């Protein structure tokens, strides 16, 4: 199944490159790619320099394929039961990512979300929409379109491809909505061992 999905993704990428990203069928273009890799605990140990190099490598791997949006999320929390990330560590992680993002260049819009619990995030987004005082319609009706827009923001299109760094037996806990209609590709390699060559292999 994974091989078949990857073959379909490759075919779509080749068509997008051959036509310069232009096609009569919008479904043939990869507009949004999600990469789920590493645990939140591993992310915390990443320096600003490592984040800069990692994000730049990701952009360089997907940009030639015409990708407009790249979202990066952890696979899981990586913490033992009862173990949590401290506020100081979370603040340091957010700062490292923000500083690294300033050095990312290219035509791809990059979104990095450090939340590892996709179900918790889903509930928080739903509650936020229902309690939105500026939108009276949200109190009575919550449409699929509004929910998708809030979950994917600032990206404005559903993911076409989800690349998971890890074995195909483990789905990312950070993704709930994004995997429903996306093609899944698994690359069984650790976060710290990931290189630009691995990313190129995954999307080539």
Predicted regions and their residues:
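Flexible, compositionally biased loop and terminal segments
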Residues: 1-204
């Amino acid at each position: 199944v994974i091989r078949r999905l990857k073959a379909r993704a490759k075919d779509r990428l080749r068509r997008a490159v051959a036509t310069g990203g232009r096609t009569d069928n919008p479904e043939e273009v990869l507009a949004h790619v999600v990469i789920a890799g590493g645990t939140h605990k591993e992310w915390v140990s990443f320096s600003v320099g490592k984040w800069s190099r990692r994000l730049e490598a990701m952009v360089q791997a997907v940009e030639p394929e015409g990708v407009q949006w790249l979202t990066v999320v952890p696979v899981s929390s990586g913490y033992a039961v009862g173990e949590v990330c401290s506020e100081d560590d979370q603040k340091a992680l957010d700062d490292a990512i923000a500083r690294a993002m300033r050095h990312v260049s290219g035509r791809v819009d990059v979104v990095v979300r450090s939340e590892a619990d996709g179900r918790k995030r889903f509930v928080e987004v739903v509650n936020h929409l229902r309690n939105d005082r500026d939108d009276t319609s949200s109190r009575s009706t919550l449409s699929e379109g509004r929910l998708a827009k809030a979950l994917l923001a600032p990206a404005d299109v559903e993911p076409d491809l989800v690349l998971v760094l890890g074995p195909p037996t483990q789905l990312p806990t950070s993704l709930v909505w994004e995997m429903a209609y996306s093609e899944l590709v698994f690359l069984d390699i650790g976060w710290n061992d990931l290189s630009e060559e691995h990313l190129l292999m995954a999307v080539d």
